[in-house]
Amino acid sequence: MLFEIDKKPISAFAAIDDSGGRLTYGELVELGKTLSASLPKRELVFCLCENKVGSLAGFVALYDNKDVCLLINAAIDRELLDNLRETYHPSYFWMPENKMADFGFEAILKYKDYVLCKTGDKAPEMHPELSLLMTTSGTTGSPKLVRHKYGNVENNARNVAKAFGWTPDERGIIDLPMQYTMGLNVICSHLQAGATVLLVAANLMNPKYWQFIKEQKGTNFTGVPFSYEILNRLRFFRMDLPYLTTMAEGGGKLSDTLFSAFANYAEEKGKRFFATFGTTETTARLAYLSPEKAAQKTGSIGKAIPEGNLYLVDENGNKINEPNVEGELIYEGPNVTMGYATSIEDLTKGDEFCGVYHTGDIAKMDEDGCFYIVGRMKRFLKLFGLRVSLDQSERIISEHYNIECACTGDDSKMRIYITKEELKDEVKKLISEKTGLISTLFEVNCIEAIPRFESGKINYKQLN
């Protein structure tokens, strides 16, 4: 089975969630057998994900049955979900039971608070190596997906578990969504180690969050930069968390101030702080900074994970060997995915990346071979650690209101430019609803005209 789950102690807990759900490794094995008897292989399944044991169990069983899952936020905007369904024609949904009435599908299997439903669509033709689909936009519901092949999830889980030194005694705190590549990686690397995943739906500001992780004696935490900003506001350094031994950060660039603060805290308290870096296209993590170097190498993403290789190239594609010279960051490894899909026909495509991924990030390497991200070449932001496409956001706003729109920003805020003052509040509300992110992450500005080049393309430099 996936992650050799059938070899784990059957009574050991694979996952516990903050709503009272519990899942043992033995129950995971049994669900796999039940699902295999109920469902043909190579079906396309939309998994509407929540941080609950039923959601996790279904994904593992479906993956092990060689069905292809697309992981989606269960709270996704219905219009965006319908768009994805019309594009890819899933034959099944794995979804919370309380959402069944919204769709009218036929339920063929119930497990805990989740159900497997038949949509009535025939499974599309798919490449035999296609194992998993994940969204690239993270939040905007773009039909552009990342195509994973068999071995991607398994290799990354194994190598991350090795890099972090996970053992069956770990109790990993997971408040990141499982449909987010980093959240899924944290789950999978713990299952690989035979450890326990603590699934948290409550956010860091909720007292229930802290009550749960204290009761369950959580041993490690993974967060995006915004998570660490909240921890700092909550006076985390004064908290009594004796069981917490490891903290990891990824999903965006942490400020140097917070990086140093948490690295120094870990060093002083005998804990470990891991800075990591990854992308959906590399099945999450591709680099990590050894915790013993964290206090000395502020802002570094470290080196490649086991079995991976990182290097820089210049604008002509030539490899850069000298330290402190900027270039595009390139990664090679068994966790590099197959490529993208934007249509149902793309699901039949083979491996287009061939084990090499051009990240689109500008980086530099120091004398010790540790890498530092300098900036991005692509037009996307990471808000709360979730990738948001500026181009897709522009399309959503322009199409909804039939207006001109331009989006820019950085990882702290998206800046939206329109030409109608009366729509400012409505635009902010719309993009907040479509992305599922709080409205304070969006700034809407009214300008006289959207600046453009002679070619008609938007001149973003005039907006920044």
Named regions from a protein language model:
Residues 218-223, 232-296, 309:
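Gly/Ser/Thr-rich phosphate-binding loop
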Residues 34-75, 175-177, 387:
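Conserved AMP-binding/adenylate-forming
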Residues 11-39, 82, 148-151:
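Conserved AMP-binding/adenylate-forming core of the ANL superfamily
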Residues 324, 328-391, 399:
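Conserved ATP-binding/catalytic segment of the ANL
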Residues 381, 408, 415, 430-464:
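Conserved C-terminal "lid"/linker of ANL adenylate-forming enzymes
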Residues 24, 130-158:
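Conserved AMP-binding A3 loop
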Residues 9-11, 50, 113, 117-135, ...:
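Conserved pre-ATP/AMP-binding loop-to-beta segment of ANL
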Residues 154-171, 179-220, 305:
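Conserved AMP-binding/adenylation subdomain of ANL enzymes
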